[in-house]
Amino acid sequence: MATPSDEAVERIKFIEQRLVDPSTVGVFQAEVIKFDMKDSIQEVLKISGEKEILKLPLYNGNQFSGLVTSRAIAKWLQKHIQNNNIELSGTVGELLDFEKKSQYEFIPTSMTIYEAWRLYQTSPKKLDALLLTENGTVEEEIKAVITYDDLLRYIYTHDQYVFN
């Protein structure tokens, strides 16, 4: 009769714990820097560069208007280069014209890490981000902007027993 190693027993216990009480996306809650449609492009680029933010939630007052990605910023910059200079005048709301639509989903804080992971895997659209709110609705305050890389990093560092 085979006796399981201590490592095998530890791994089984870990997997059981993850199945019984899975981690939720609430672990990603952090301060989210939001921008208003009327903010200057120059100021937004400065802040996003300093804070290394690649996904920018945009609001019109208190109403969510969209998510701008670094891809849209690059497209905007390409269209505004003249004589090897880029004029940074304008508002961040103009960036939405360079952004594809529906590249994000709102999700509730109660969603498990693996449900969020599955969303990235099964969504018919290529998601750029999951926007975390208390109940997963657009009307609520965004508590986190979760990328595919964020989930992958979390799973790899916290759930390595599941994948090894």
Which role fits each region the language model picked out?
Residues 8-31, 69-128, 145-164:
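Tandem CBS (Bateman) regulatory domains
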Residues 34-39, 43-84:
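Acidic (E/D-rich), amphipathic helical modules within compact regulatory domains
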Residues 36-39, 108-112, 135:
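A structural micro-motif recognizing beta-strand termini
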